[in-house]
Amino acid sequence: MIDKEKIKKAVREILEAIGEDPDREGLLETPDRVARMYEEIFSGLHTDVKDVIKIFQEDEHQEIILVKDIPLYSMCEHHLLPFIGVAHVAYLPRKGRILGLSKVARIVDVLSKRPQLQERLTSEIADTIMEAVNPLGVAVVIEAEHLCMTMRGVKKPGSKTVTSALRGIFRTDQKARAEVMALINSKR
């Protein structure tokens, strides 16, 4: 579990370290607010992703299933600044085993709510779906803006990082890969 008291103490010390007065009017409740925020945005650390997965048997469906533009936010583990974007998650069912559509979004949500790297998050989503339903293939593409590149360092607001993870047939078969990427990149 998250130790909110430790977080409050640490935030107070950070405020002091940057030359602020943690006892001034506008900052009095900041340590508590940050502790509650961290409990929420890092809730994926204490959630087993398997608990959000529900599998259905749908023998008739044997084509690509794609959930596009799933909003996501996570905290870059290098600077503890957010990265915000969307995930596109596609898979090709095997023997009719499918995930509920909302479960795809929940997988993204749980795995995002941890200190993360976008590259690892992309792979974790793909691997979770591979393990859960053993599809013929999985493709995950994440597009995100990293505030560590927007607010500091290179200071390039609006730049996006795109990562992909391909598993199964989407990695080994060029035609299948082209089809799934065309679906992901379509504007409709």
Curated annotation (Swiss-Prot):
Gene3D superfamilies per record: 1.10.286.10, 3.30.1130.10
Binding-site residues, Zn(2+): 76, 79, 148
GO biological process, one term: tetrahydrofolate biosynthetic process
GO molecular function terms attached to this record: GTP binding; GTP cyclohydrolase I activity; zinc ion binding
Keywords assigned by UniProt, alphabetized: GTP-binding, Hydrolase, Metal-binding, Nucleotide-binding, One-carbon metabolism, Zinc
EC number(s) on file: 3.5.4.16
SUPFAM superfamilies per record: Tetrahydrobiopterin biosynthesis enzymes-like
Entry keyword Hydrolase: yes
Any Pfam family: GTP_cyclohydroI
Catalytic activity: GTP + H2O = 7,8-dihydroneopterin 3'-triphosphate + formate + H(+)
Record pathway: Cofactor biosynthesis; 7,8-dihydroneopterin triphosphate biosynthesis; 7,8-dihydroneopterin triphosphate from GTP: step 1/1
Name the record gives this protein: GTP cyclohydrolase 1
Gene symbol of the encoding locus: folE
